[in-house]
A protein has these predicted regions:
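N-terminal flexible segment immediately upstream of the FAD-binding catalytic core
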Residues: 1-57, 74-104, 119, 133, ...
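A common structural junction motif
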Residues: 16, 62-64, 125
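Conserved strand-loop elements at the edges of beta-sheets that form or border functional pockets
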Residues: 46, 68, 110
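ATP-grasp fold ATP-binding core
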Residues: 66-68, 130
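Glycine-rich beta-strand-to-loop/alpha-helix junction loops that act as flexible
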Residues: 69-73
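FAD-binding subdomain of flavoenzyme oxidoreductases
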Residues: 96-100, 104-110, 114-194
């Protein structure tokens, strides 16, 4: 671990709990086919968008490579990088799911497991139609990143067709949001497809 990375971690320790910054041992992230491997000495586990923003803002300033890692079910190696002294940003604690009965909407964080989303919808008498073989371990952030289709794609569309808004943290730490009320969703620009 280089001195810049040590400085990065020391600054983050002021804002995050010890359980959110794991720097003991070596973390390995493999693709499901065991062809690619990503190694890092540090894994950070933010719980909300503001923490992700702080982490990325500081990493951008100090030029620390960040590798976001979700369920690691993707087959194209998106969770693998070639950098040294990279930091893994685990999305596992970004798993909150809320159902809004009045507007008939789900709001989910990027680390939410697809089967958990489907179960919550079912508990409220609704259907979240994305159906994948990996739904017990894949995360919705990865589904959106790859525009997953699944078994019901012909009837309901890809996952981006099911998404009405998006909140994302840019590499410089700025937060982008297209989260609006249902009335404001009529837009000529398909911002989610960009």
């Amino acid at each position: 671990m280089n001195s810049n990375t040590v400085h990065f971690i020391n600054i983050l320790k002021k804002d995050l709990s010890e359980s959110q910054i794991v720097s003991t041992g070596s973390f390995e992230v493999k693709d499901p086919r065991d062809r690619l491997l990503n190694k890092s000495e540090i894994c950070i586990k933010p719980k909300n968008t503001k923490e992700v923003s702080k982490i990325l803002r500081l990493a951008y300033k100090l030029m620390i490579p960040i590798i976001p890692v979700g369920g690691s079910t993707g087959l194209v190696g998106g969770q693998i990088a070639n950098e040294t002294d990279q930091v893994i940003l685990s999305l596992e604690k970004l798993n909150e799911i809320k159902f809004y009965k009045k507007s008939n909407l789900l709001k989910v964080q990027s680390g939410a497991i697809l089967s958990s989303i489907k179960n919550l919808a079912l508990n409220h008498g609704r259907l979240f139609p994305l159906t994948l073989a990996s739904e017990g371990s894949c995360q919705i952030g990865g589904n959106l990143a790859t525009n997953a289709g699944g078994l019901n794609v012909i009837k309901y569309g890809n996952v981006r067709d099911l998404c009405l808004g998006l909140e994302a943290v840019l590499p410089n730490g700025k937060i982008f949001s297209s989260m609006k009320s249902l009335k404001a969703l009529i837009s000529p620009i398909a911002i989610l497809a960009l």
